[in-house]
Every structure is written in structure tokens, then in C-alpha cells.
């Protein structure tokens, strides 16, 4: 267990530090999309420990004023970009704000993450962290539709229908020249390594036997219609959103279907 939480939401700080040591990567330059005010994020630990170049992106009011006060901002080269990212602007935003080789790319916007990754060039970074939705389980190969301005709590009141399934994410990342090495303990952030770092050399001890090991999460963050927590667990989470429409990506399709149609 290498998970250590310093500034990350869970144990991503420890995982990243371990991966950089394993890959023998000296630079720690990063791009992170979906950072909020940056107090709890996947790359803040890297920034404050190693002072690399970085780009953080989110769409919150007074973002710079909220981020700068608690950082030793002068110690590293951090660009703060206030932008609502979608599949149409992602490449332009990266090209305009990132003038360095990316060592770690992190994406977590609880939204159309699949469609944003789909637009990225292959092998954009050495390490890639992407959030997935464990509620979709291990077998479904789905994502929410590519809706402009997608909001998780608006698409379904339960807050459970967002993002993509782990299986869909892994297949997409394989097309982008990465391989999957596992997730955090909470089972919502997947870690991928560029094929430039051969699995046989760096992670020959890792064997992915079943995706169930990365989707059976005990997180209970579901909401009632009045926005109070409903604490759904197990199969009840997927049952709650069975009427929601998702894109079925199985067999290279992109069919818009209700989740319940995929469960029958």
C-alpha cells in the first residue's frame, strides 16, 4: 500500500511519488484539470515538494485569488487557467498554456471526461490519472453523452450518472498508447503509464485479473431529490440511474441507450 494523503482527496500523493520513483523520472511537470481551489488536488503535493512547471485548470470564481495565498507561488512555474473545459476547446487550451513536456496529466471533472480524453493526442504524458465512475461496474463500456455544459447534479438528481465506466476508459487509454496499472483504494481514480515505459520492465509484478477489483466501491455519495444524502450501496446505485441515457461504446458503437437496456 503506497497511498499517502497530503493534499490529494485520497491517497494519490503517495501513489504519484511512488510511480515517479519507479519510473526514475526526475522532472515532475504536470497538467491537472478539475482542481477546485487547489487545496485538495492530485498535483499540489508535487508542486510544493518539487516546484516544477504546472498548469491547473478549472472554472471557479476568483480562482487565482483562492489558489495563490496558500502556495509558495514564487517557488515554481504554475499557470492558473480559469476555463470550462470541453471536447471542443481542450487542445486549444493546452496548446496556449502548456509550453513544457508533461510528466503527469490528471483529469477529474465529473462530466464528459471521456470525450475530452478522446481529443487528446496519444502519449501526452508519462503518467495519466483519470477519474471513472465505479457505479457503472466492471462490464459496461459506457460514457455520458458529449453534452455541452454537462452538470453531474443536473443530469440526474442522484449525482450518480456522470463520467465513464472503467472498461470504457481503459480501452480509450489503450488507443492513446497507455496501459492500466490500477486505481486508488476508493476506486474512482485510474492510473495509466505510457507505453514508453514497458510494463514488462517497470510493472511486471502487476496483473489485472478482474476489473471488479477496481469497481466494487463502498463510496455512498448518492442524493435524494431534495439533495440530502441517500447512502445507496451495492447494486442499488446502478438501479437508481437505470433510466438515464448513456453512450454504449461496446463493439465500437456509439449508441445512445438507457442503462436498463444494457442490463437486461
Give residue ranges: language-model regions.
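SAM cofactor-binding core of SAM-dependent methyltransferases
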Residues: 3-107, 134-137, 224-228
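Rossmann-like AdoMet/SAM-dependent catalytic core
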Residues: 1-24, 31, 39, 93, ...
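A short, conserved alpha-helix within the catalytic core of class I
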Residues: 111-123
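Short, structured coil segments at secondary-structure junctions
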Residues: 49-50, 123-124, 176
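Short, catalytically relevant binding-site loops at active-site mouths
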Residues: 111-113, 134-137, 188
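Conserved beta-strand signature within the Rossmann-like core of class I S-adenosyl-L-methionine
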Residues: 125-134
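Short glycine-/acidic-enriched loop or helix-start segments at secondary-structure transitions
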Residues: 41-42, 66, 115-118, 139-140, ...
Amino acid at each position: 500500500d503506497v497511498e499517502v494523503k497530503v493534499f490529494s482527496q485520497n491517497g494519490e500523493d503517495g501513489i504519484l511519488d511512488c510511480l515517479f520513483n519507479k519510473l526514475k523520472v526526475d522532472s515532475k511537470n504536470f497538467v491537472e484539470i478539475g482542481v477546485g481551489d487547489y487545496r485538495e488536488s492530485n498535483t499540489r503535493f508535487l508542486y510544493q515538494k518539487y516546484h516544477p512547471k504546472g498548469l491547473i485548470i478549472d472554472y471557479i470564481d476568483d480562482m487565482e485569488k483562492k489558489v495563490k495565498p496558500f502556495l509558495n507561488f514564487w517557488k515554481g512555474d504554475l499557470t492558473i487557467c480559469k476555463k470550462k473545459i470541453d471536447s471542443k476547446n481542450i487542445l486549444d487550451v493546452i496548446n496556449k498554456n502548456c509550453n513544457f513536456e508533461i510528466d503527469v496529466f490528471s483529469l477529474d471533472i465529473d462530466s464528459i471526461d471521456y470525450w475530452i480524453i478522446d481529443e487528446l493526442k496519444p502519449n501526452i504524458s508519462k503518467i495519466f490519472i483519470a477519474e471513472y465512475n465505479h457505479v457503472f461496474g466492471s462490464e459496461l463500456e459506457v460514457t455520458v453523452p458529449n453534452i455541452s455544459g454537462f452538470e453531474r447534479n443536473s443530469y440526474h438528481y442522484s449525482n450518480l450518472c456522470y463520467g465513464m465506466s472503467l472498461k470504457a476508459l481503459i480501452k480509450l487509454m489503450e488507443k492513446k498508447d497507455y496501459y492500466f496499472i490500477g486505481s486508488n483504494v476508493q476506486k474512482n481514480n485510474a492510473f495509466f503509464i505510457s507505453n514508453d515505459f514497458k510494463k514488462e520492465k517497470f510493472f511486471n509484478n502487476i496483473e489485472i485479473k478482474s476489473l471488479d477489483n477496481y469497481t466494487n466501491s463502498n463510496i455512498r455519495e448518492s442524493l435524494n431529490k431534495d439533495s440530502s444524502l441517500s447512502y445507496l450501496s451495492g447494486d442499488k446505485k446502478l438501479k437508481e440511474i437505470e433510466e438515464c441515457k448513456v453512450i454504449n461504446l461496446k463493439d465500437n458503437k456509439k449508441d445512445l441507450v438507457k442503462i436498463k437496456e444494457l442490463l437486461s
